[in-house]
């Protein structure tokens, strides 16, 4: 399946290799795993570490700054198939393919895909050439989304949502405008009508312009998130009230 996540996971066991004691080695990225009907892991920050996983009867190394490694770092159960010859060398992991995450296993043309930022990766999830074949690996504070892809007639996945508040601090009872966009595999976005946005106990639907206005709840720190049937729920954005 085109672009469906390559990587590995054998049966649960993922061992973390020792990481160099540098600032780079301590870098983390934001990760979320969204299945057919539920969020399976995250959102959370996961360290960029070299990891290993068992595939069949052998243990294979996975490069530290790859979507497959951070998937393993969430602790979610997953299984992989090796279409190459993975080994103790991370450079051999480029053909690992993710067949299952949690209860959701590939079926027909539907299966697991990852995005880095807004774009679907064009390379294997543990490919040493990077997610887009440029040699660039994951970097500190990037967003990595694993999601269950339902292919359409054009061989594209459903859009993934992104919610943006007009500001990230508001007073209780104040109006807060938010905008929701949906991004395709290439990272091209459109404003989304009919998305449900939530901030604590406040909720609203977006209009044709992709915008909605929420009434800020009581003082506190809240996650702002957007969802719509047929699209992938957004990463949450933290909003401070009060």
For every predicted segment, state its role:
Residues 1-24:
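Secretory targeting and sorting signals
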Residues 21-242:
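Ubiquitin-like/PB1-type beta-grasp interaction modules and other compact soluble beta-rich domains
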